[in-house]
Amino acid sequence: MAEKRNIFLVGPMGAGKSTIGRQLAQQLNMEFFDSDQEIERRTGADVGWVFDVEGEEGFRDREEKIINELTEKQGIVLATGGGSVKSRETRNRLSARGVVVYLETTIEKQLARTQRDKKRPLLQVESPPREVLEALADERNPLYDEIADVTIRTDDQSAKVVANQIINMLEKS
């Protein structure tokens, strides 16, 4: 990879976007950003609070602006929020400004990885988490597929192994 292309990680919550993104950025000596963490840094509040106060629409507006700004940078790895792909503008920007890697995982792995995480506003509802994750997958998986340049299944692999797979795929392209 002679020139450093932006790498944008998309996929459902619990797929490993943040963990794998940090590993990937470290291995490639690139700057890492996480859109949810960037929202928290700028608002001084956690994502759950932003959701509670501004609703999902307010949160998505913030997310779209931050992703637009971050994708204008060069040589970054960006872990996006699972729902960021709901915005056509965001999908277009991700596709146009870098390589989009879809980190795919099963509902079972998502449940295992998110069960104790209270920072997931869409899971802090009365519906059973499995039903919520299945509904989100039905809505979002086609959008991830639509913009993915590369798709990698993360189920039983370490962040380092997945990062190496991404690097190998990028070197071939």
Curated annotation (Swiss-Prot):
Pathway membership: Metabolic intermediate biosynthesis; chorismate biosynthesis; chorismate from D-erythrose 4-phosphate and phosphoenolpyruvate: step 5/7
The UniProt catalytic activity note for this protein reads:
shikimate + ATP = 3-phosphoshikimate + ADP + H(+)
Which residues take part in binding ATP?
Answer: G14, A15, G16, K17, S18, T19, R120, Q157
The UniProt entry's GO CC annotations, sorted and at most eight, read:
cytosol
Cellular localization per UniProt: Cytoplasm
Q: Which UniProt keywords apply?
A: Amino-acid biosynthesis, Aromatic amino acid biosynthesis, ATP-binding, Cytoplasm, Kinase, Magnesium, Metal-binding, Nucleotide-binding, Transferase
Domain of life per record:
Bacteria
> Mind telling me which PROSITE patterns this protein's record contains?
SHIKIMATE_KINASE
**Family annotation (SUPFAM superfamilies):** P-loop containing nucleoside triphosphate hydrolases
Answer yes or no on keyword Cytoplasm: yes
Which cysteine pairs are joined by S-S bonds? none
Database matches in Pfam families: SKI (PF01202)
- For Mg(2+), which residues are the binding ones? S18
One record GO biological process: aromatic amino acid family biosynthetic process
Describe the function of this protein: Catalyzes the specific phosphorylation of the 3-hydroxyl group of shikimic acid using ATP as a cosubstrate.
NCBIfam families assigned to the protein according to its UniProt record, in alphabetical order: PRK05057.1
Q: What protein does this entry describe?
A: Shikimate kinase 1
